[in-house]
Swiss-Prot record:
PANTHER family: C-1-TETRAHYDROFOLATE SYNTHASE, CYTOPLASMIC (PTHR48099:SF5), C-1-TETRAHYDROFOLATE SYNTHASE, CYTOPLASMIC-RELATED (PTHR48099). InterPro entries: Aminoacid_DH-like_N_sf, NAD(P)-bd_dom_sf, THF_DH/CycHdrlase, THF_DH/CycHdrlase_cat_dom, THF_DH/CycHdrlase_CS, THF_DH/CycHdrlase_NAD-bd_dom. The keyword Transmembrane helix does not apply. Its EC number is 1.5.1.5, 3.5.4.9. Homodimer. It catalyses: (6R)-5,10-methylene-5,6,7,8-tetrahydrofolate + NADP(+) = (6R)-5,10-methenyltetrahydrofolate + NADPH; (6R)-5,10-methenyltetrahydrofolate + H2O = (6R)-10-formyltetrahydrofolate + H(+). SUPFAM superfamilies: Aminoacid dehydrogenase-like, N-terminal domain, NAD(P)-binding Rossmann-fold domains. GO terms for cellular component: cytosol. This is Bifunctional protein FolD. Pfam families: THF_DHG_CYH, THF_DHG_CYH_C. Pathway: One-carbon metabolism; tetrahydrofolate interconversion. Keywords: Amino-acid biosynthesis, Histidine biosynthesis, Hydrolase, Methionine biosynthesis, Multifunctional enzyme, NADP, One-carbon metabolism, Oxidoreductase, Purine biosynthesis.
Amino acid sequence: MSAQLINGKEVSQKRLQAVAEAVAQRQQDNLHMPCLAVVLVGGDPASAVYVRNKKTACQKCGIKSLSYELPESTSQEELLALVDRLNADSEVDGILVQLPLPKHLDSQAVLERISPDKDVDGFHPYNVGRLAVKMPLMRPCTPKGVMTLLEAYGIDPKGKKAVVVGASNIVGRPQALELLLARATVTVCHSATENLADEVAGADILVVGVGIPNFVKGEWIKPGAVVIDVGINRLDDGSLCGDVEFETAKERAAMITPVPGGVGPMTIATLMENTLHAASLHDA
């Protein structure tokens, strides 16, 4: 029997609508309009698409967006100076620096320069640390989006065995913290993990984010598992696929996210929620 598809597009539209309603209510209450500043360095085509999608989401929600498109040659000092200006600008609630940055720039130093209360991506060590001690402030967008999807489909991680494949700072590590916060029993797999197939086979909830097409084989999936595929990879023929071998996995899983249309839309919806949350922090 084929798995039920987890429709991220549908869930994200509901979340965006809720943000739009909250923004409209803020206007009625004479509170300031939330504002997101997006910084793009260089001309990476995929990054340009992501930035465009974020601007579109802002328009849907009534969130003001400011765009800063900097040349590839931008220096570390110039980028940090822009972040400092945005930190000091009381009109700006959220700051997003689109990753990856050109190789000559230090991404970590840039992310750490963003004020934690404006870190709507949730990448600042302060925000990851707060998540680790069960006091989240700004939650990383993709992991929080995954948790929103699970909630929307009535999947409670409490007491379940959750396996996260991939240990990146953007997805894997904060995803493990989110699942731990939801009281799952969490295993994190990475490049040094032995017997990956055995680890995957024990998962009630499987979250994969490694950036390698079809990395997790369908036959590894535990029958009845919930599979969340965070990967999005473009193949030589131009088609998109995830990190999980979809066609075989959907014959074993109970529920699975498609690629595209699964986790991706949730990341942007969560970004809008975080920007709204940041605005509320700045009301006082």
